[in-house]
Amino acid sequence: TMAEFEIPAEVIWAKRGPTFTLYELKLGPGYQIAKIRSIKENLIMRLAIKQIRILTPIAGKDAFGLEIPNKKRDIVGLRSLISSPEFNSTDKGIRLCFGKTLDGTNFIEDLSSMPHLLVAGATGTGKSVFLNALIVSILYKYSPEDVRLILIDPKRVELAVYKNLPNLLIAETIKENAQAVSTLKWLTEEMDRRYKFFEEVGCANIDQYNNGFRDSQKEPKMYRIVLVIDEMADLMMKGKGQVETYVVRIAQLARACGIHMIIATQRPTVQVITGLIKANILSRVAFSVKSGMDSRVILDDPGAEDLLGNGDMIYSSTKGTTRMQGALVELAEIKKVCDSIRANNESVFNDDLLNAITVKPEIEETEIDSSEGKDEKADDFEEMLKQVMLHFIKKGKASISSAQATFGLGFLRAKKFVDALEARGYLGPETTGSQGRTILLTEEEFLSRFDQN
């Protein structure tokens, strides 16, 4: 084909991958590499393909490359990566299944070493499927004691399948912009709390604390937190200043305390992925985008505009750039995983975060003026208080979210019961983490004291 354009070039190596085949070619003497780029559109037409990616030159070689789409693409199932030795060889950090590279290698990355990830791509290119693959990777490998997730889903439907999972920090995905900003604020405060705690106990990071500084018989592990934002553009449109400030601060400081972010957008513009955000998140994934300018925003280089869609992606990090086919996980498989986790595990959610994002106060019932009405209302409160405490004793731990889920209460009403139980000496104070409050009485002791009161 090159001969048709009067360019002497020799194929010196070729390798077929899941999505494309890479051909390495050597130019004849006296020909400039710019000549290859000038015939790109002609090559696409001559080869009857949708797209071609030209690598000029290939680092460390006296050659250039042509990435040409395969007529039949190989599917890279997430299951094959999850069962691979690369994924299961260690439990350290947070292992994520990305996909398969040109030579068929399973590409597994550690989020804790990134320590944050930026994902961008046009609609329908595989971005949402990739996010699901990352989330399911975490669900397969890590318990809620190891990793907890916060899911921000302004589009309201993309991440709804994960609600009420034990691995979530709160039961629902976060949909409202105001709640998302409150979540980011809470995360920065949690980061500060963790660093203050590390200073008090004399350790430098979360791994040191979990592996040596805590009393494993008495103190639970400190879990890592992964924040997933499915569409950054929506947040930046309505609260750019606050969102950017919180995201940058977390990106700069949160690695050692075990807080990580995965931020995705279908609009890789400088208004969404600002210079400050880019400067602090160096691990990035690009799916197919509309233009070379969009590619530069996410990768700092062109190339993503030549990707083929349907999971074809480029991963850029401090270690270099890799093109691969992203892992595929179907919705039916996600539902099966989530249903199994819910059926076999109890959920204990974080009341602190739930409180922080509660923007609309619950409307309290109107008090009845008559003394009879007041007594009746007090009796109702006492009876519900008793049932809530008996539920906590049966479960062995107490939390606002547990009262909400069991009795169908709003947050403020459930909090009122828990605060009353603490004030009467039935429950211990609120603790950091997912362990809930300590129950201070047996069922017999509680019933005896409660009836006396």
Where do the language-model regions lie?
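Terminal-proximal interaction/regulatory segments of ATP-powered molecular machines
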Residues: 1, 11, 359-453
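N-terminal anchoring/assembly modules that precede and organize ATP-driven motor systems
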Residues: 1-26, 30
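P-loop NTPase catalytic phosphate-binding loop
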Residues: 9, 22-26, 35, 44, ...
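Short beta-strand
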Residues: 10-16, 54-58, 429-431
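A short interface-forming secondary-structure element
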Residues: 24-33, 38, 408-409
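Short, charged/polar, Gly/Pro-enriched secondary-structure boundary elements
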Residues: 29-33, 71-77, 444-449
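Short, low-order "capping/linker" segments at domain edges
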Residues: 65-75, 366-369
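Long, charged amphipathic helices and adjacent flexible linkers at domain junctions
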Residues: 347-362
